[in-house]
Structure formats: structure tokens, C-alpha cells
């Protein structure tokens, strides 16, 4: 929509119909696609509490309660063998499902790792680590 304003006597100016900005003692410039506001979004550090610990035998760790729209990082370290799965729940942990991508298992680890495994968009979802260890001690951290 184009807004046309006419200069009428006795005024020698036309009020802006849109936001404008400018430097001190400089003319104001209208905001438009070619001249956006000089701002950038700042994201504060995540407020979610990391899930961290170690397992010397098979077991379940969790829950991790993520903030929305942030990557969920899984860090696994130590001298361990077995498999570790990142599980997701939307009912407070009553049921937990493995992550999948295109129907194939996702976020299943058999070695030390440090990677973004998921990003959450549903309020109330929680994450768990399920380890099936055949030896050693696993040190884990799930965080944002």
C-alpha cells in the first residue's frame, strides 16, 4: 500500500507515516526494506539446567527440560562401551521415544560425542539418556 501525503500551506513539511531514524543533528531516514533499523536480536544464555553425571552400569538419566528453539547438545566422554540413546517424552516421562529422522534411529551413540542432537519446539517436552553399557564408565552432559 502506498501512502501519498501532500504538503499543505502553511506547513513546509510532511509528517512521516512510518518509523524513521537518524544520527544526532542529521536528517531522519524512513525505515523500509532497503533501509532497515540498525538493530540485531540478542539471545540471552539458556536458562535450562544441564543434565550431567556419570553411569557405571546401564541406566536412565533425566529429565532434561529444554528451552524452546535452542539446540540440545549431547556430550559423552569416558572409557565406556555400549550404546546411548537420547529419548524424548511429552507426558512427563511416562513414555519415552527414541529420536528418529526419516524413520531411522537418530541420536544413538556408540562412542564419545559432542554434538547438537535436537531442537525443541513443543512446550513440556523432556529428554532422557538411556545407556546400555557393556563396560566402563560413561560421563554425560545434556545442555543448551
In which residue ranges do the predicted regions lie?
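Hydrophobic beta-strand segments within beta-rich accessory/binding domains
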Residues: 66-79, 85, 127-132
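Conserved Ser/Thr-centered positions that define the repeating blades of beta-propeller domains
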Residues: 87-89
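Tryptophan-centered short beta-strand motifs
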Residues: 25-28, 36, 93-106
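Beta-sandwich interaction modules
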Residues: 60-67, 100-144
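Acidic glycine-/aspartate-rich tracts in secreted/extracellular proteins
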Residues: 80, 91-93
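Surface-exposed or flexible loop/turn and strand-edge residues in extracellular/cell-surface modules
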Residues: 26, 34, 69, 81, ...
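Extended, low-complexity segments enriched in Ser/Thr/Gly and acidic residues that occur primarily
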Residues: 1-62, 66, 71-75
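Short, surface-exposed coil-to-beta transition loops
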Residues: 81-83, 114-115
